[in-house]
């Protein structure tokens, strides 16, 4: 019985720790969609809107609309990696599909035969 109680308390502590851990949030831009005639909820700021809607400019001043989320492009370019000349299919699984899935400054780049999180090559600007 003591083992079950200890296990339950351990699981509760783990759940609490995971809930407090900072989550990775990729940088994004929020854009307002084109206004439609069916939108009637007027607003002055995002605080006037419900749920995930935001206050967007409209002919009436402002209306609550569901925003368009656009990923912010990351700096740099992917390093060049020569693909191996293999006669068989690649059996590696990709780690990512686009840059928004990568932490920090890393980019989602082709490496050998799958997509990987890689450090970008930053272009130097001529002075």
UniProtKB/Swiss-Prot annotation:
Cell division in keyword set: no
UniProt domain WAP: residue ranges: 26-68, 71-121
Give the molecular function GO annotations. Answer: peptidase inhibitor activity
Free-text tissue specificity from the UniProt record: Milk-specific; major protein component of milk whey.
Looking at the keywords, is Cytoplasm present? no
Signal peptide positions on this chain: 1-19
Name the UniProt record assigns to this protein: Whey acidic protein
Q: Which organism is it from?
A: Oryctolagus cuniculus (Rabbit)
Gene that produces this protein:
WAP
């Amino acid at each position: 019985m003591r083992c079950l109680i200890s296990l339950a308390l351990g699981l509760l502590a783990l759940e609490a720790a995971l809930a407090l851990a900072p989550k990775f949030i990729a940088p994004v831009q929020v854009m307002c969609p084109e206004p439609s005639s069916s939108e009637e909820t007027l607003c002055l700021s995002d605080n006037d809107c419900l749920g995930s809607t935001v206050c967007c400019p409209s002919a009436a001043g402002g209306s609550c609309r569901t925003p368009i989320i656009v990923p912010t492009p990351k700096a740099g370019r992917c390093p060049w990696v020569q693909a191996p000349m293999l006669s068989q299919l690649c059996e590696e699984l990709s780690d990512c599909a686009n840059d928004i899935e990568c932490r920090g400054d890393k980019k989602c780049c082709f490496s050998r035969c799958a997509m990987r999180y890689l450090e970008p090559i930053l272009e130097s600007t001529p002075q």
